[in-house]
Amino acid sequence: MSALGFPKTPSDKKALEEGAVFSPRFDPAGLVTVVVTDAEDGMLLMVAHMNAQALALTLETGIAHYWSRSRNALWKKGETSGNFQHVVEMRTDCDQDALWLRVKVLGHDATCHTGRRSCFYRTVGLVDGKGTLVDDGSKPLFDAEFTYRKPSS
């Protein structure tokens, strides 16, 4: 567990938006949204969430940690797949309620649990009044079924 804490969000809007103190604004669930892009080419890789512990561990280790809302657990990105995200730069938006990580992905250079480089591999369209998804043709860079298989009992 990290010992790093974050100061309370300042009530002064100018201090929040222009000041030099990082005081992330966590939502009522204790999370902040994180947008992740490739540090070299800018490709959008994923959107995730961090709680205070994940954020502190990311700052302290330089490896991205997130909070899994579906598993309700801390998640070190790449721990199972080997596709760790080395943080090159972290930015916050004007009111400090969202973060942007620029990362170098290690391992297979894949970010998505499907084995693809990006979680954004489908385009959204509208055909005959219905939402459609079209795969962009990107192929998995590793065998996700093998990598994430459950051990047999």
UniProtKB/Swiss-Prot annotation:
Annotated EC: 3.5.4.19
Places the protein is found: Cytoplasm
GO CC terms of this entry: cytoplasm
Residues that, per the record, bind Zn(2+): C94, C112, C119
InterPro entries named among the record's database cross-references: PRA-CH, PRib_AMP_CycHydrolase_dom, PRib_AMP_CycHydrolase_sf
Binding-site positions, Mg(2+): D93, D95, D97
GO biological process terms held by the UniProt record: L-histidine biosynthetic process
Cofactor(s) named in the record: Mg(2+); Zn(2+)
Signal peptide: none
Pathway it works in: Amino-acid biosynthesis; L-histidine biosynthesis; L-histidine from 5-phospho-alpha-D-ribose 1-diphosphate: step 3/9
Catalytic activity: 1-(5-phospho-beta-D-ribosyl)-5'-AMP + H2O = 1-(5-phospho-beta-D-ribosyl)-5-[(5-phospho-beta-D-ribosylamino)methylideneamino]imidazole-4-carboxamide
Pfam family, one: PRA-CH
Annotated family: Belongs to the PRA-CH family.
Database matches in PANTHER family: HISTIDINE BIOSYNTHESIS BIFUNCTIONAL PROTEIN, HISTIDINE BIOSYNTHESIS BIFUNCTIONAL PROTEIN HIS7
Described function: Catalyzes the hydrolysis of the adenine ring of phosphoribosyl-AMP.
Description of how the protein assembles with itself and partners: Homodimer.
Protein name (Swiss-Prot/TrEMBL): Phosphoribosyl-AMP cyclohydrolase
Organism: Mesorhizobium japonicum (strain LMG 29417 / CECT 9101 / MAFF 303099)
